C-alpha cells in the first residue's frame, strides 16, 4: 500500500505528515443488527480524525442505498482484509445491508470527521465533489448514488445481438 501511495505522489515529504499503512486492525464495535465484530485499521483508530475519500458509484455486484462509496470504504476499506473477509463470508444477497450496518458502526465508534464524495461522468471526468459530515454520509450518500447512476456510461439500446468490448475491468463502471 505504501508503494501504491508513493506512486500517486502521496509521501511523507509531499504531505508534510506521516503516511502509515499496515494490515493490523482493531475491533471498533459490534454491528447493530447481526451482532458481528466490526474492524478498522489500527492506525486510523488511533488517529485524531479520519477523513474518508471515495468515488460514489453503482456497485457491479449488488444494489442498495449504499453501494460503492464512503460507507463501503469504511466497511471494507478501513476494515482491511479482516473486515472485508467478515463481510464477504456472508451472503451476497445482504451485502448492501452489511455495508450500511458496518458503516454506521464505524461512524458511531471511530474518529470519522467526514468524507469527500466524488462523482464522475461517463468520460471518467470529475462531475461533482462534495464534502460531507459524518451525519451527512448516511443521509446524502444514497442521493449522490442516484446522481451517479445518471452520469455513468450507459448502453444506448435495449436489445443487442452482439457486443464487442474493448476494455473491461473492476475500474470501469457503467450500466
Regions found by a protein language model. Give the residues of each.
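Conserved, well-structured core segments that form the ligand-binding/active-site neighborhood
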Residues: 40-171
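An acidic, phosphate/nucleotide-engaging active-site surface
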Residues: 2-65
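Short, intrinsically disordered, charge-balanced linker/junction segments flanking boundaries
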Residues: 174-175
Amino acid at each position: 500500500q505504501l508503494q501504491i501511495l508513493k506512486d500517486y505522489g502521496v509521501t511523507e515529504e509531499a504531505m508534510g505528515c506521516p503516511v502509515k499503512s499496515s494490515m493490523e486492525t482493531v475491533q471498533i464495535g459490534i454491528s447493530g443488527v447481526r451482532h458481528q465484530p466490526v474492524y478498522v485499521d489500527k492506525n486510523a483508530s488511533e488517529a485524531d480524525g479520519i477523513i474518508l475519500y471515495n468515488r460514489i458509484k453503482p456497485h457491479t455486484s449488488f444494489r442498495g442505498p449504499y453501494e460503492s462509496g464512503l460507507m463501503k470504504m469504511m466497511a471494507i476499506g478501513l476494515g482491511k482484509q479482516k473486515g472485508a473477509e467478515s463481510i464477504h463470508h456472508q451472503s451476497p444477497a445482504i451485502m448492501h445491508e452489511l455495508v450500511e450496518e458496518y458503516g454506521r458502526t464505524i461512524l458511531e465508534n471511530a474518529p470519522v470527521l467526514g468524507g469527500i464524495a466524488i462523482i464522475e461522468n461517463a468520460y471518467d471526468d470529475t462531475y461533482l465533489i462534495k464534502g460531507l459530515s459524518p451525519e451527512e454520509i448516511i443521509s446524502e450518500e444514497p442521493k449522490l448514488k442516484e446522481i451517479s447512476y445518471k452520469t455513468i456510461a450507459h448502453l444506448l439500446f435495449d436489445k443487442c445481438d452482439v457486443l464487442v468490448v474493448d476494455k473491461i475491468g473492476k475500474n470501469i463502471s457503467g450500466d
